[in-house]
């Protein structure tokens, strides 16, 4: 496995077939070069602007298995950056597309909660209610990278979860 998803998250997980490919993919993920990860998230409260960039410092609380936004001077704080844009809306929910620039513990969950837009179903980060399946409405939609051996561009896209709300919002994305 070249990267991880939080347990309640759905979507793309990338596996390497050889140790050589694993070593090269791990290096790409660590350097954040030649890898682009795109997530979709459903939030009840839309962010303050239809698109933006979030840049914070996160500190991981091991005991609570949670990250929080802190001052840059905080001991063990790590820089976290992502960009987002609203891609669809319904009467009660907003679908965001998120591109990670860094890959920190619970980064998307923590940064969206910090701007008042917790992910639907994410009780740990401020959602009012859990989802019926116990998951959260965060989906690893796509990974784009350069193949470590052939050097060809690869794009892997995961279908959205089989859920009425996901399908409703996907159908609301303008063409």
Report residues per predicted region.
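RNA pseudouridine synthases
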Residues: 1-175
């Amino acid at each position: 496995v070249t990267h991880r998803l939080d347990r309640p998250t759905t979507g793309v997980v990338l596996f390497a077939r050889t140790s050589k490919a694993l070593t090269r993919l791990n290096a790409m993920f660590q350097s954040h070069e030649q890898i682009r990860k795109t997530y979709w998230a459903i939030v009840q409260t839309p962010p303050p602007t239809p698109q933006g960039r979030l840049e914070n410092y996160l500190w991981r609380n091991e005991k609570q298995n949670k990250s929080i936004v802190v001052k840059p001077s905080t001991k063990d704080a790590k820089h976290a950056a992502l960009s987002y844009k609203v891609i669809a809306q319904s009467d009660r929910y907003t679908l965001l597309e998120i591109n990670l620039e860094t890959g920190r513990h619970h980064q998307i969950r923590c940064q969206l909660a910090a701007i008042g837009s917790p992910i639907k179903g994410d009780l740990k980060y401020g959602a009012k209610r859990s989802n019926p399946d116990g998951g959260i409405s965060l989906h690893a939609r796509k990974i784009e990278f350069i193949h470590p051996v052939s050097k060809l561009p690869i794009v892997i896209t995961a279908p959205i979860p089989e859920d009425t709300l996901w399908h409703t919002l996907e159908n609301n994305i303008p063409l």
